[in-house]
From Swiss-Prot:
Pathway: Amino-acid biosynthesis; L-arginine biosynthesis; N(2)-acetyl-L-ornithine from L-glutamate: step 3/4
Any Pfam family the entry gives: Semialdhyde_dh
Organism the protein comes from: Photorhabdus laumondii subsp. laumondii (strain DSM 15139 / CIP 105565 / TT01) (Photorhabdus luminescens subsp. laumondii)
Role, per record: Catalyzes the NADPH-dependent reduction of N-acetyl-5-glutamyl phosphate to yield N-acetyl-L-glutamate 5-semialdehyde.
UniProt GO MF annotations: N-acetyl-gamma-glutamyl-phosphate reductase activity; NAD binding; NADP+ binding
Name of this protein: N-acetyl-gamma-glutamyl-phosphate reductase
Originating gene: argC
Length: 334
């Protein structure tokens, strides 16, 4: 059994992590923690998330002393703000823990990106260089050796799973940048109350146009430029991405289908549609990314869906942990 703790367990993603880890046969969920300043400190986890009453009734302990918190702990999950993960991940790593960070603090190796897109100067570039990007279907061998796994963002996960097989097999004319229009449920904005996620204010609208921090993450790990526009939808959870691409001359739908099937034939959490395209309702509450596509001439439209809190966050973190420690990849997820 591996002893584990979750920091940031009061939020939506942290709650999903706690539920997965509680039912994982090889994990011993020792502690759920929040920042020392959190208004949720010392509350019972299941009082905040009543669906887990009688299942996970641990207290939310304030994180005041990382050295003590890390004692006897093998695995740490950080469901914390970017700046917080930036500061505390190296301390848990120094204590010998394996860290799965769900923030953006270690996803992009170019340190200059953090000042521009995240608003802080990165001070741990040595860990930027060592962090393994946890796109599970494409980084399994590297994840197996990692001490720090940077779990991808929600939009980058679905975008890359849709585009990587096409780019790796040189099927796209990348002089025409892929155009990614993706809509997320309001849970992507977090649990903290704000005008943005107020019931009466939620509509369907784009945000972060040309400035969203997931743009450089997608581009760095795809190795190509893209046009990415995120949207906020008036539903609780899930992401649907519609991606428009230009094909190289002569590329057929049959080739595209074969490329996808070869890429994901042994990847149980990616489901491919042979007919039609996926709908959001088929992935909400599940750890899958569903992918379908339509071709007309040299134009390709790929549609990908995922639950932003699961395959876009908590489920992928647990998937990476399973890979890292040699467990069944879908352990506790299905």
């Amino acid at each position: 059994m591996l002893n584990t703790l979750v920091v940031g367990a009061s939020g939506y993603t942290g709650a999903e992590l706690a539920a997965y880890l509680h039912r994982h046969p090889h994990m011993n969920l020792i502690r759920l923690m929040v920042s020392a300043q959190s208004v949720d400190a010392d509350k019972c986890f299941s009082d905040l998330h009543p669906q887990y009453k009688g299942i996970v009734d641990l207290p939310l302990q304030p994180l005041t002393d990382i050295i003590n918190a890390a004692k006897g702990i093998d695995v740490v999950f950080l469901a914390t703000a970017h700046e917080v993960s930036h500061d505390i991940a190296p301390l848990f790593l120094a204590a010998g823990c394996t860290v799965f960070d769900l923030s953006g603090a270690y996803r992009v190796q170019n340190a200059q990106i953090y000042q521009q897109y995240y608003g802080f100067k990165h001070k741990h570039t040595e860990w930027l260089a060592q962090a393994v990007y946890g796109l599970a279907e494409w980084q399994a061998e590297n994840i197996k050796q990692a001490q720090l796994v940077a779990v991808p963002g929600c939009y980058p996960t679905v975008s890359q799973l849709c585009l990587k097989p096409l780019l790796e097999n040189s099927l796209l004319d990348i002089s025409y940048w892929p155009v990614i229009n993706a809509t997320s449920g309001v849970s992507g904005a977090g649990r903290k109350a704000s005008m943005t996620n107020s019931f009466c204010e939620i509509s369907l609208q784009p945000y972060g146009i040309f400035t969203h921090r997931h743009q450089p993450e997608i581009e760095e790990h795809l190795g190509t430029r893209v046009v990415f526009t995120p949207h906020l939808g008036n539903f609780a959870r899930g992401i649907l991405a519609t991606i428009t691409c230009k094909l190289k001359p002569g590329v057929t739908a049959e080739q595209i289908d074969e490329v996808y099937r070869q890429a994901y034939k042994d990847k149980p959490l990616v489901r491919l549609y042979s007919k039609g395209v996926p709908a959001l309702k088929s992935v909400v509450g599940l750890p899958f990314c569903d992918i379908g596509f339509v071709v007309q001439g040299d134009h390709l439209i790929v549609v990908g869906t995922e639950d932003n809190l699961l395959k876009g966050a908590a489920a992928q973190a647990v998937q990476c942990m399973n890979i890292r420690f040699g467990f069944e990849e879908t352990q506790a997820l299905l």
